[in-house]
Amino acid sequence: MASEKSTSKGQAWFCTTGLPSDIEIEVDDMTFHLHKFPLMSKSRKLHRLITEQETRSSSSMALITVIDPKVEETDKKGKGHEIEDDKEEEEVEEQEIEENGYPHIKLEDFPGSSESFEMVAKFCYGVKMDLSASTVVPLRCAAEHLEMTEEYSPDNLISKTERFLSHSVYKSLRESIKALKACESVSPLAGSLGITEQCIDSIVSRASSADPSLFGWPVNDGGGRGNISATDLQLIPGGAAKSRKKPSRDSNMELWFEDLTQLSLPIFKTVILSMRSGDLSSDIIESCLICYAKKHIPGILRSNRKPPSSSSTAVSENEQRELLETITSNLPLDKSSISSTTRFLFGLLRTAIILNAAEICRDLLERKIGSQLERATLDDLLVPSYSYLNETLYDVDLVERILGHFLDTLEQSNTAIVEVDGKSPSLMLVGKLIDGFLAEIASDANLKSDKFYNLAISLPDQARLYDDGLYRAVDVYLKAHPWVSEAEREKICGVMDCQKLTLEACTHAAQNERLPLRAVVQVLFFEQLQLRHAIAGTLLAAQSPSTSQSTEPRPSAAIRNLTITEEDGDEAEGERQVDAGKWKKTVRENQVLRLDMDTMRTRVHRLERECSNMKKVIAKIDKEGSSPATTTDRPRSWSITKKFGCKFKTQVCDSHEATMVDHRSRRS
């Protein structure tokens, strides 16, 4: 029988054995013209159905003739319609048997599709089948439904499919995922047979032994490693060689994430729960959730927003909300080891706000983001205000809540923080990030001063090494809100620490007309203090030439001592060489300071000469002003004053006086 062939014509399937068919079996919309003996020899259920069909067809004529007309009229008042329906079905079967010469059986609850029954028929005829992970599951369920057991016939279909599942499917991660996908069409029977559970167990066990270095790829904007350009690979040491050496292994390992995205949400949820109960790495679980969310939630990443293809099925808002809450509830609570996960979490949060997800879902996302806020970018923080209650362009309250979660996490994990000079690197990164966010939202005309002030002071003092970024945000806010009162201006400027402003920021602030007078005075005071410290340090270094000259021969003496005591050991020699090098560096710095001081003296003398010349010119102008032609010569004197840069009342001080007035303070 192995040489027998099958053909399909429209909605009918024929077995071309040279013998006429003697039975019809209908599955879905397909009618199979087959032979009784091959089917009855392998399937107990088909044997029973065919026997019952033949018995019923042979006795149906006698049953019809025995019926009394009076009884029929009486039954019509109660159950007459049911008898008529049975009679009609029997008449249809008799008509089919009379027309075709063989019975017709319709399998109503057959698991799988007509393709599965076609494979069953081929097995009954002895035709070789090509099994796969996608076809073996419905075929196993069909064999169970048709009672194709080993007791009924040796080497039957149930044992054949079980062997294939054990030897080929359960031993492979990707094959187990494909088989699990096939379980969806026959889920009740596949679950009762244990196929679904065994596939999930295989996935969990195989995933735990996979390469953990590959679990970072789903969160990348491109979605995989295949988007890395050749130039980027050349920048990685050995990257091009590694990509040429093992392309197939990496691609195969990455594809099982994509296979998981083909599962339906209920089965995928079961897989994730099994992974969590199996103590799998949080990176594996998180990568699976990220890849599944990117596949089924459109527009979750700003940089990867593509129009949906015609082949993709539209997902309703309720389904997206359910999926989003499932993804969020299963995310690991601990900090992710994948830095780019933060952008994905912000995308989830934006989608949760748009879909009006549950409050607990949004709170979980905010806490998760807060635990790794130092990895965020300014673009991540710019979440639009989707609520009509917020007048601002961006959701400032959201950022304030996330920042609060970050500070709580930082306080709870003091032992895990590596501090440098008493400052936390994570805290300083967040401080720079918040300053950038403040500068971005400061131009919003609807931003209240209290909200700006509260967000600016929410960070501790050690979060900022310099307050230049905060000053920039304050300046932008005052420029965009000219109607703010003087008291509010002073309050907003109070968020800055003028001692943390750099010299460039102090110079700009001293000339800033938008700052209140109190703030300008503070800036000028600390700017003058910085200049005094700088000048004092330069003078102290320059006023000790005798000390440096008297100690200049020391390097040669130290070198002679080093040559004499070479045999004292390698350690002593190394220390002395280091001391000699430090001494040479110190002498060189002193020489540079002397040169700088000489240059400064030269500039001071030149300024004194210019000042004396200006005094003479001004005195000459004053003498000419006493003549009657003063009114006519005023434009000339004004031009001379402008020529020498005297915008205000001229005040010249001697460089040898104890107090010097900075020219920037006069411009303020």
UniProtKB/Swiss-Prot annotation:
Gene3D superfamilies: Potassium Channel Kv1.1, Chain A
InterPro entries: BTB/POZ_dom, NPH3/RPT2-like, NPH3_dom, SKP1/BTB/POZ_sf
UniProt record, GO biological process: protein ubiquitination
Domain NPH3: 254-530
The keyword Phosphoprotein appears for this protein: yes
Pathway per the UniProt entry: Protein modification; protein ubiquitination
UniProt KW keywords: Phosphoprotein, Ubl conjugation pathway
Transmembrane annotation, as ranges: none
Phosphotyrosine sites (modified residues): 471
Pfam families xrefs: NPH3
Stretches the record annotates as Disordered: 73-98
Compositional bias of kind Basic and acidic residues: 73-84
Compositionally skewed regions (Acidic residues) per UniProt: 85-98
BTB domain segment(s): 21-133
Entry remark concerning the domains of this protein: The BTB/POZ domain mediates the interaction with some component of ubiquitin ligase complexes.
Biological role: May act as a substrate-specific adapter of an E3 ubiquitin-protein ligase complex (CUL3-RBX1-BTB) which mediates the ubiquitination and subsequent proteasomal degradation of target proteins.
Family per similarity comment: Belongs to the NPH3 family.
Protein name per its UniProtKB record: BTB/POZ domain-containing protein At5g66560
